[in-house]
């Protein structure tokens, strides 16, 4: 989860509010372009913020290997599969997946296929531009990097080394 503590001692959670505060404080570094492109960036950022989160929750809690990895790191000890049942969040995961439309195996496969497909498109784009939408960063890059850094590259599954 993205967290930002401000000089006023506010703690902001979630990428979208964090980006909005940063834009207000550092307008020269704005991640939301002006005019029509800014509208598109805002819409894509908002959609990806919710869509990527649901896929990440699926990966984390439908794959015991991922749950074991994150709960071992969080507890500071090497857990066994049988230990997972002791963690309330382990039981929360499947409920969250049901609420976000990744409960059924067919929904899980569809979400994974969409996510991997999006990453492949992004990789192709980044072969010709520095950032997802061109040669300067936008809020879309922040959203994409958040899911990649916090989950995809940190958890055992999916394995993007292929």
Language-model features: locations:
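GST-like domain detector, emphasizing the conserved glutathione-binding G-site
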Residues: 1-82, 132
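GST-like fold's C-terminal all-alpha helical module
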Residues: 54-162
């Amino acid at each position: 989860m993205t967290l930002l503590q401000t000089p006023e001692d506010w703690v902001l959670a979630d990428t979208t509010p964090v980006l909005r505060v940063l834009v207000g404080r550092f307008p020269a570094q704005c991640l939301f372009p002006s005019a029509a492109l800014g509208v598109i960036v805002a819409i894509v950022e908002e959609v990806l913020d919710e869509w990527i989160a649901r896929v990440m929750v699926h990966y984390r809690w439908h794959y015991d290997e991922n749950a074991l990895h994150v709960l071992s790191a969080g507890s500071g000890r090497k857990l066994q599969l049988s230990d997972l049942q002791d963690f309330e969040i382990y039981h929360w995961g499947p409920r969250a997946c049901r609420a976000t439309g990744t409960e059924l195996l067919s929904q899980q496969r569809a979400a994974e296929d969409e996510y991997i497909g999006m990453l492949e498109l992004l990789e192709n784009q980044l072969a010709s531009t520095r950032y997802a939408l061109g040669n300067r960063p936008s809020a879309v890059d922040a959203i994409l990097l958040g899911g990649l850094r916090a989950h995809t590259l940190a958890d055992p599954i999916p394995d993007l080394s292929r």
